[in-house]
Amino acid sequence: MRLSHTTLALACSALMLCACGGGDGGGSSQSIQSDAAAATSTSSTSSTSSTSSNANVAASAAAVAVCGANSTSPLAGVRTWMYQLQDLLTDAQINALDAQPYDMVVVEAGNTVKNQETFNTAGMVTRLHTKADGSPRKVIAYIDIGQAESFRTYWIDNQWKTPTATKPGVPDFILTADPDGWADDYPVAYWDQRWQDLWLGTNGAVAQLAREGFDGVYLDWVEGYTNAKVVAAAKKAGVNPAKAMVDFIAKIRAAGRAINPQFAVIQQNAPELIDAVGAAKLLPNLDAISQEDTWFGGDAGASWGDASGTDQATESADTQWTIEQLQKHCAGGLPVFTIDYALTSPNPRTVYTTSRSLGFRPLVSRVSLSKPTTTPPWNY
C-alpha cells in the first residue's frame, strides 16, 4: 500500500512539511520530475535486464555494498526473505514455507485472527526459526499499526462499528475506510491511547508476539500519517501526525525489546517519513525499512492466480523518487528491503537486478502473498 508521488505531494502540502520529498542525503522532489532522468533510468534498467547473464548478475550483486550490512541491526545479515500473510495454518502450508532457504520470513500471527484463536503461533514460529540446513532464520510478525482490521480478535463485533462516509466508527479513533480498496481495513487515530493500549504494555500485542518467539515486527500503514482523514483528526487533536507516528514506532520497539533485547522493527512504505521528522529522529527507532511497488505492483485484493495482482509498472518518476528516499535510509546504515509484485518475464529479473545493484534486499511475489513466491531470488 504505497502512495503515488502526486498523492504524497498533496498530503505533504496538507501537513505543511517543508522537508517532504527532499531532505538530507537525497534528491529534491523537483529533481525527480525530469522526464529525461526517468527515461534514462528506465532505459538503463531495461538494458541491464536484457543483457546480463546469471553469472554477471551474481557478480554485480556481490560487488555492491549491501545497505546496513555492517550495522548493528539484528537484520544486518539477512540477504533473502519471504513475505507470506495467508494460508499458513496447516502443517503442509507451514512445511512448504519452512523448506525454503530464506534468511527471514514475514508472516501473520495466526491466533490474532477471529476463529483462529487456538492456532499454535508459537509452535509455527519455533518451526520456522530453523532452516533445513540447521542454520537460524529470522521470523517477523506482520502487524498493521495504522489501521484497525475488523477480522482481528481485538475487534469486538457487538461494540466496534465501521466508519461511514460522514462519521467515524466506534470507537471513534476508527476514522475512515482504506483508500486503496482493502476490505475490512480502517485507518485510525494511532496516537489515541485506546489504540496504543492494544499494542503496548506487558499484556499488549507486541509483548505477546515477542513471547511467542517472533524476532520482530513488520509495520504496515506507517503511511497513515499522510491520509487526509488522519491529518484532519490530528489537526483537531493538536497532534503532529508524523511525529506521533515515530513516537508510536519507538514505543512498539521498546515494548518488544523489554522481552527480547534484539527485537527488530521494520517499517513498510512511507519512505518520506525520514524527511518529515529527520533522520536523527526516525532511524534510531528502526532496524530496517521495506518498500512495496518500487518497480511493479498489483490490485488490492487480487487472488494468487489473478493476473491483476502482478506486473503493473510503477511510473518511472515515482520509482526514481522512491529509490532516492530509500537511499537516505541506506546512507543512515539501515537495511533496505524491497517487495514487488511481478510474474511475467523479464520483470522479476529487472527487479532483482536493479534492486541488488542499489544495495537493497529484493523479493518478487504476487500481491495476495498467500504462497511462497514462484519467482524466488535464487532464480535470478
Language-model features, listed with the residues they occupy:
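Substrate-binding cleft of secreted/luminal carbohydrate-active enzymes
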Residues: Q320-Y380
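Short, acidic/polar
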Residues: M82-A99, W195-A210, E272-G278, N347-V351
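N-terminal carbohydrate-binding/catalytic regions of secreted carbohydrate-active enzymes
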Residues: V66, N70-V170
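Aromatic-lined carbohydrate-recognition surfaces of secreted/lumenal glycan-active proteins
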Residues: Y142, A242-A276, L334-Y341
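C-terminal motif of bacterial Sec signal peptides marking the signal peptidase cleavage site
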Residues: M16-A19
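Substrate-binding cleft/loops of secretory-pathway carbohydrate-active enzymes
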Residues: I266-G301, S345-L363
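Active-site-adjacent "subsite" loops/lids of carbohydrate-active enzymes
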Residues: E149-G204
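Bacterial signal peptide processing site
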Residues: G21-D24
